[in-house]
Amino acid sequence: MDLLYRVKTLWAALRGNHYTWPAIDITLPGNRHFHLIGSIHMGSHDMAPLPTRLLKKLKNADALIVEADVSTSDTSFANLPTCEALEERINEEQLQNLQHISQEMGISPSLFSTQPLWQIAMVLQATQAQKLGLRAEYGIDYQLLQAAKQQHKPVIELEGAENQITMLLQLPDKGLALLDDTLTHWHTNARLLQQMMSWWLNAPPQNNDITLPNTFSQSLYDVLMHQRNLAWRDKLRAMPPGRYVVAVGALHLYGEGNLPQMLR
């Protein structure tokens, strides 16, 4: 990389975050400018509407880039294979933890009897978010997608909903690690959600090297975070000259092996 690019990158890092939302600006050689936003896929009523300054950034951008277009994609888990009884797929301790959390969330355990383990984990996580007052229509990426449509902006998917489902279907042991991590780090997950909400409601991180609680096993982190960051990095590096607003899950912006570090 040329010296001028390195100087610009260092200067941007020294300036720190000057936005009222979690975001990092990255400029790549070839006049490519990315405004990376730490999105939350479900948000609270207080997180709408989006900041005026952010909407102006979108207006001045050439395109909006998201993980998947959740405004049009059918992400319902239809036509999934039926699994054997839950008691035959998880151990006694995991079953007891699942029953306890299901009762706490007001979910009938029978709902999970033949669902894939990764799907059970995602249903639990979504229900937990709802209990904290979060709704999909207030999610940051959903609001950005609606604004992009109003502004007639192109929308580019980093992976798309269908590829996300394929990735989940290919998890080792049919997603056992994802369910186990969800059960084990249940209360930590709730605190992490509240922390990410505060980045939008109160103040974003001022230090891009913040330490976040680890709620994934290493093998799962590699699949759900590291490998996806690598794929997204390659896709962003291949973009033509222009200005882009990029919305990815907030955890992809901070912590170990984050997307901005890979792009720099």
Where are the predicted features?
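Structured, acidic catalytic/metal-binding patches in enzyme active sites
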Residues: 3-11, 20-216, 220
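A cross-kingdom marker for long, charged
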Residues: 222-264
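A conditional alpha-helix N-cap/helix-loop micro-motif detector
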Residues: 16, 47, 137, 225-229
